[in-house]
């Protein structure tokens, strides 16, 4: 960074003063003009000041960035201002707390902001940071505070040791370097052993600030404190801002930092020694029990190592697996022979999210999330693989057949020593074949080189224990064979507000160890695709997302792809198009009569009538023209319009005849038709990428306080769920465990029921409050009428009296 600043200063001095010789040569001339000299000296002083004080320059750059950010937020021409119908928050939203906060785009930081906003919607993550990280750290600090006496004694011993290693109060030469290395390594070791939750605290504080209730205010915060707490933060350029990175990469960095903090709280390494079932803790997490909790999960050891039951079949052991964060789960992978069914044991491993690849064929087509999950978990066939059991079985059959042949021959013709050796080998193979799994060591000892059997194996992976917060990454990078470049696959992925993971999950007691059978013993759950098949949002949201996509089109990349595609299409059309084909070589160009048309039919050199060919071509041409006109009309509406702000387009398009009215936002808490099960997860947030592979913008949709928010850096506003589910360019999805074990319902549904009941109570109170003033008003009006009648009677009696008060009559 210092070299970069120095180069900029030298360039500036070169521009202002020329070379140093020119500056000295013209110094006397400049001194005659005091004004110019003062200006140059002032500029030179400012440059030197910023060179000596780079922090002040950073502060000014950040201040200017903040000023431009404020202008961008407050300016009506902002690119991502909310639409006019969203500027007014419903009273129901205000009752729930109003606006949530945004995040400042500090130069290409939309990928960070979208990930942080998505994580802020997770209840499981917030509870984990409060209870499992910060509270544990406070307990450790309290225990260390109670043991301060021992710490002071150890510090005195260390000081005495340092004093004894010095010579005359100083250390020289190689001995000094050796001590420095020892002290630095010791300090690093102590730092690594000390609990450090700096990042976790910064993350919790930032997420809490985002989730606070701001009502009608629209605040936004910076991510500087969080990035400073990261050991590997994204690279930043002082002028250009942060390097554009992938949201998935930043998400992985967040997980790495969080895991590092959790490990610092417990420096003891996880003991993977199997534990007997009788010695398991009372609250042990076995299989899929208590999916919302994070901790040590126990898996049956006999599934991992089937030969473990040979020691003692009466004792069932469990192997521990440590889940560090709420985003950690466990997958089960089975690789087995399709001929004998043997597998080397189920491979359980901890994962922190799923990455689903889009198919390379039919780029741009519409896909389903359930389809991508099924492709991820479908069995993979591996051909030409050695199988230990099949090879030893073949060797056993061969040797056993030899023994049968030996028995048929006369006694003494075969050496007894050879017969005994074959019998011993057969017996050894039979003992090994009796094991559940044949180890590689036994296979190497007993197999015969010419008895190797190649077979086919199946490889399949399922989710054994889903994490409390499941992250799904849609990998949209695809290799384009036409341009030999990596480009973005813009296929639309349909997803639901709730996801039943049952078809892709398998508990520990539901796994088939025989590879010839389906991996899961349970019947394949019916995938509920009803909501995915619907065109959610309709035409309005389709055009809306097209406008957002057009905002971040990379013209150069699209042009290269279009040129390559156009060349391919033109070559294809050139070889297939017969519209200019003339079998008569222009001999009948001037013929137009009906008789001459018949002549064309009769003289076709290819055996086809010219008239028929012309009619078919004209029909096709007319159909193409008609289709092109229809496409042109669609393009005129959706694609050929100038790229202007979406909000301005929606406002100005109100005068057009074919304007599509925006659907109203449903602020009420909705209920899903997906059944409530422990494996039913609720959608919490969605990260969307607009643009191409090399250029674009990340935004986030996240559900909080019962409604969906669209967040583009500093800009935050409410949207309908239909807009979220109709998003075509989904990049990441976050589904959260939402099942309430006590009631057997989803927590979102319970909150919706409670909210609806509160609204009904408020309406009843309002109605009662309206009726009571009406009754009191009617009662008051009756009293006023009675007083008026009495007053009239009094006035009438007064009219019949004279001044003296006597009755005139």
Curated annotation (Swiss-Prot):
Record-listed E.C. numbers: 3.4.19.12
GO biological process: protein deubiquitination; proteolysis; regulation of protein stability
Basic residues composition-biased segments: 162-183
GO-annotated cellular components: cytoplasm; cytosol; endoplasmic reticulum; endoplasmic reticulum membrane; nucleus
Region feature (Disordered): 143-195, 569-596, 750-809
Catalytic residue positions: 110 (nucleophile), 697 (proton acceptor)
One example GO MF annotation: cysteine-type deubiquitinase activity
Protein's UniProt keywords contain Translocase: no
Top EC class for this record: hydrolase
Start and end residues of each USP domain: 101-738
Compositional bias (Basic and acidic residues): 184-194, 765-777, 790-809
Positions of modified residues (Phosphoserine): 530-531, 555, 618, 638, 653-654, 670, 755
Residue ranges with Acidic residues bias: 778-789
Top-rank taxon: Eukaryota
Role this protein plays: Has an ATP-independent isopeptidase activity, cleaving at the C-terminus of the ubiquitin moiety in natural or engineered linear fusion proteins, irrespective of their size or the presence of an N-terminal extension to ubiquitin.
Name used for this protein in its record: Ubiquitin carboxyl-terminal hydrolase 1
Annotated source species: Saccharomyces cerevisiae (strain ATCC 204508 / S288c) (Baker's yeast)
Gene giving rise to this polypeptide: UBP1
């Amino acid at each position: 960074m210092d070299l970069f600043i120095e180069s900029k200063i030298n360039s500036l001095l070169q521009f202002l003063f020329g070379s140093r010789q020119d500056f000295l040569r013209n110094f006397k001339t400049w001194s005659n003009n005091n004004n110019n000299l003062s200006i140059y000296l002032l500029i030179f002083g400012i440059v030197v000041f910023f060179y000596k004080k780079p922090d002040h320059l950073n502060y000014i750059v950040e201040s200017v960035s903040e000023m431009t950010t404020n202008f961008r937020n407050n300016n009506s021409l902002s690119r991502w201002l909310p639409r006019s119908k969203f500027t007014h928050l419903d009273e129901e939203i205000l009752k729930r707390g109003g606006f949530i906060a945004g995040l400042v785009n500090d130069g290409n930081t939309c990928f960070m902001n979208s990930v942080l906003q998505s994580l802020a919607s997770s209840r499981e993550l917030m509870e984990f940071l409060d209870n499992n990280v910060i509270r544990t750290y406070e307990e450790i600090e309290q225990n260390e505070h109670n043991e301060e006496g021992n710490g002071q004694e150890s510090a005195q011993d260390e000081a005495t040791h340092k004093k004894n290693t010095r010579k005359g109060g100083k250390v020289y030469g190689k001995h000094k370097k050796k001590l420095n290395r020892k002290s630095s390594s010791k300090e690093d070791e102590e730092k690594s052993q000390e609990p450090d939750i700096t990042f976790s605290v910064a993350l919790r504080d930032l997420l809490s600030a985002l989730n606070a209730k701001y009502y009608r205010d629209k605040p936004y915060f910076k991510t500087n404190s969080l990035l400073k707490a990261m050991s590997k933060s994204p690279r930043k350029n002082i002028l250009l801002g942060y390097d554009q990175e992938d949201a998935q990469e930043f998400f992985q960095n967040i997980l790495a930092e969080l895991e590092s903090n959790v490990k610092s709280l417990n420096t003891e390494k996880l003991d993977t020694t199997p534990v007997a079932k009788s010695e398991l803790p009372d609250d042990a997490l076995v299989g899929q029990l208590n999916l919302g909790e994070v901790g040590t999960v126990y898996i049956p050891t006999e599934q991992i190592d089937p030969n473990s039951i040979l020691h003692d079949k009466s004792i069932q052991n469990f192997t521990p697996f440590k889940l560090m964060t709420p985003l950690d789960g466990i997958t089960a992978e089975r690789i087995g022979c399709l001929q004998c069914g043997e597998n080397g044991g189920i491979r359980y491993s901890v994962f922190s999210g799923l990455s689903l690849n889009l198919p390379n064929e039919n780029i741009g087509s519409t896909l389903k999330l359930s389809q991508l999950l099924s492709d991820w978990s479908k069995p993979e066939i591996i051909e030409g693989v050695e199988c230990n059991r099949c090879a030893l079985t073949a060797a056993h059959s061969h040797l056993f057949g030899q023994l049968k042949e030996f028995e048929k021959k006369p006694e003494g013709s075969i050496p007894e020593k050879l017969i005994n050796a074959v019998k011993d080998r057969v017996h050894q193979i039979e003992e090994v074949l009796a094991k559940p799994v044949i180890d590689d060591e036994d296979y190497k000892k007993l197999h015969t080189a010419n008895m190797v059997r190649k077979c086919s194996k199946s490889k399949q992976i399922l989710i054994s224990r889903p994490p409390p917060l499941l992250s799904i990454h849609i990998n949209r990078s695809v290799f384009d064979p036409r341009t030999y470049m990596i480009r973005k696959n813009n296929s639309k992925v349909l997803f639901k507000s709730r996801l039943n993971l049952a078809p892709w999950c398998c508990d520990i007691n539901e796994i088939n160890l025989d590879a010839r059978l389906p991996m899961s013993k349970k019947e394949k759950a019916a995938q509920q695709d009803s909501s995915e098949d619907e065109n959610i949002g309709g035409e309005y949201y389709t055009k809306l997302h097209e406008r957002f996509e057009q905002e971040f089109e990379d013209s150069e990349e699209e042009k290269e792809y279009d040129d390559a595609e156009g060349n391919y299409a033109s070559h294809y059309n050139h070889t297939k198009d017969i519209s200019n084909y003339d079998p008569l070589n222009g001999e009948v160009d001037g013929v137009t009569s009906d008789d001459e048309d018949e002549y064309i039919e009769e003289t076709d050199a290819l055996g086809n009538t010219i008239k028929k060919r012309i009619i078919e071509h004209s029909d096709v041409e007319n159909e193409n023209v008609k289709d092109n006109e229809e496409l042109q009309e669609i393009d005129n509406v959706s694609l050929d319009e100038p790229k202007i702000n979406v909000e301005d387009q929606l406002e100005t398009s109100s005068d057009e005849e074919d304007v599509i009215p925006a659907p109203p936002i449903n602020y009420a808490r909705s209920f899903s038709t997906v059944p409530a099960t422990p494996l039913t997860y609720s959608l919490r947030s969605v990260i969307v990428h607009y643009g191409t592979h090399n250029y674009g913008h990340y935004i986030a949709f996240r559900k909080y306080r019962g409604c969906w928010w669209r967040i583009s850096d500093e800009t935050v506003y409410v949207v309908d769920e239909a807009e979220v589910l109709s998003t075509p360019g989904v990049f990441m999805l976050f589904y959260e465990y939402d099942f309430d074990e006590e009631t057997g319902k989803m927590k979102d549904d319970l909150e919706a029921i409670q909210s609806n009941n509160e609204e009904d109570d408020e309406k009843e109170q309002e109605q009662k409050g309206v009726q009571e003033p009406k009754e009191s008003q009617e009662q008051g009006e009756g009293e006023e009428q009675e007083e008026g009648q009495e007053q009239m009677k009094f006035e009438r009696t007064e009219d019949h009296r004279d001044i003296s008060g006597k009755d005139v009559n």
